[in-house]
């Protein structure tokens, strides 16, 4: 059976793994998921990630990050979904928690944070909020 929203599946796997204090989480890999993991790593929300290939299927393994026993990611939620895409222009890209969190945006110049998209002067599809 095909998955209708693979990005939401990745975010749910991360959320569920952190609720039970897992150190790593695996999910089927794709270019967008790897780009999201790279943004999460650059922003300090995860320790790292790697793509593993077994018998032609690639898996994305994310190493989760904790501080004083609590997950670093307090909130991670999907914004744009297959049934309701959310596109924002460069001036309308939202701030998450007054700049304390990040919105991950996919733009013509790649997947990036809301701050980088504003600085670059591009808009795009708001994939998710992370705080």
From Swiss-Prot:
Swiss-Prot/TrEMBL keywords: Ribonucleoprotein, Ribosomal protein, RNA-binding, rRNA-binding
Organism superkingdom: Bacteria
Any GO molecular function: rRNA binding
Any one cellular-component term (Gene Ontology): ribosome
Pfam families for this protein: Ribosomal_S8
Gene3D superfamilies (alphabetical): 3.30.1370.30, 3.30.1490.10
PROSITE patterns listed in its UniProt record: RIBOSOMAL_S8 (PS00053)
One BP term from GO: translation
InterPro entries tied to this protein: Ribosomal_uS8 (IPR000630), Ribosomal_uS8_CS (IPR047863), Ribosomal_uS8_sf (IPR035987)
Subunit structure: Part of the 30S ribosomal subunit. Contacts proteins S5 and S12.
Record-stated family: Belongs to the universal ribosomal protein uS8 family.
NCBIfam families noted in UniProt: PRK00136.1
Function, as annotated: One of the primary rRNA binding proteins, it binds directly to 16S rRNA central domain where it helps coordinate assembly of the platform of the 30S subunit.
PANTHER family linked: 40S RIBOSOMAL PROTEIN S15A
Record's protein name: Small ribosomal subunit protein uS8
């Amino acid at each position: 059976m095909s998955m209708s929203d693979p990005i939401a599946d990745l975010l749910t796997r991360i959320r569920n793994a952190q609720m039970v204090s897992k150190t790593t989480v695996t999910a089927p890999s794709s270019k967008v998921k790897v780009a999201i993991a790279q943004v999460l790593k650059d922003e300090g929300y995860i320790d790292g990630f790697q793509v593993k290939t077994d018998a032609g299927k690639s898996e994305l393994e994310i190493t989760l990050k904790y501080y004083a026993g609590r997950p670093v990611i307090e909130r991670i939620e999907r914004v744009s979904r297959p049934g309701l895409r959310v596109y924002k222009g460069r001036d309308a890209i939202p701030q998450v928690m007054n700049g304390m969190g990040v919105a991950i945006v996919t733009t013509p110049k790649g997947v990036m944070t809301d701050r980088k998209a504003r600085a670059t002067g591009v808009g795009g599809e708001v994939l998710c909020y992370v705080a």
